C-alpha cells in the first residue's frame, strides 16, 4: 500500500491517471464528453491523455518499473 503523500504515491497516482486518461481517449462516448475541453480544469484530462498516447512506450516502461519497485523493493 502506498501513501499518497509520499513521492512514491505521487508517482503511482500520476502514472495511473495518465494510463486511465489514455484509455478513456479510446472510448468514443467518454472521449467526446470528458476530453473535449482542452483548456482549464478539464484540460488536465486531455493533456494526460495526450501524454499517454504519444509516450505510450515510456509510460508502459515506467509502470513496469514502478510495479517492480513496489512489489519487490518496498
From Swiss-Prot:
A Pfam family reported for this protein in Swiss-Prot or TrEMBL: DUF1242
The segments annotated as topological domain Extracellular are 23-52
Gene Ontology terms: cellular component: Golgi membrane
Where does the record locate the signal sequence feature? 1-22
Sequence ranges on the Cytoplasmic membrane side = 74
Q: Which InterPro entries match?
A: Kish-B, Ksh1
UniProt KW Transmembrane helix keyword: yes
Its topology with respect to the membrane?
Single-pass type I membrane protein
Which of UniProt's keywords are assigned here? Golgi apparatus, Membrane, Signal, Transmembrane, Transmembrane helix
User: TM segments?
Assistant: 53-73
Which domain of life does the protein's organism represent? Eukaryota
Where can this protein be found? Golgi apparatus membrane
UniProt keyword Membrane, yes or no: yes
Q: Which family does it belong to?
A: Belongs to the KISH family.
Write out the function statement from the record. Answer: Involved in the early part of the secretory pathway.
Spell out the protein name for this chain. Protein kish-B
Q: Which organism is it from?
A: Danio rerio (Zebrafish)
**What lineage is this protein's organism placed in?**
Eukaryota, Metazoa, Chordata, Craniata, Vertebrata
Tell me the gene name.
Answer: tmem167b
Amino acid at each position: 500500500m502506498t501513501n499518497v503523500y509520499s513521492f512514491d504515491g505521487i508517482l503511482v497516482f500520476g502514472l495511473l491517471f495518465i494510463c486511465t486518461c489514455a484509455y478513456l481517449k479510446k472510448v468514443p462516448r467518454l472521449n467526446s464528453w470528458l476530453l473535449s475541453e482542452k483548456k482549464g480544469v478539464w484540460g488536465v484530462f486531455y493533456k494526460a491523455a495526450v501524454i499517454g498516447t504519444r509516450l505510450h512506450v515510456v509510460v508502459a516502461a515506467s509502470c513496469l518499473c514502478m510495479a517492480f519497485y513496489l512489489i519487490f523493493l518496498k
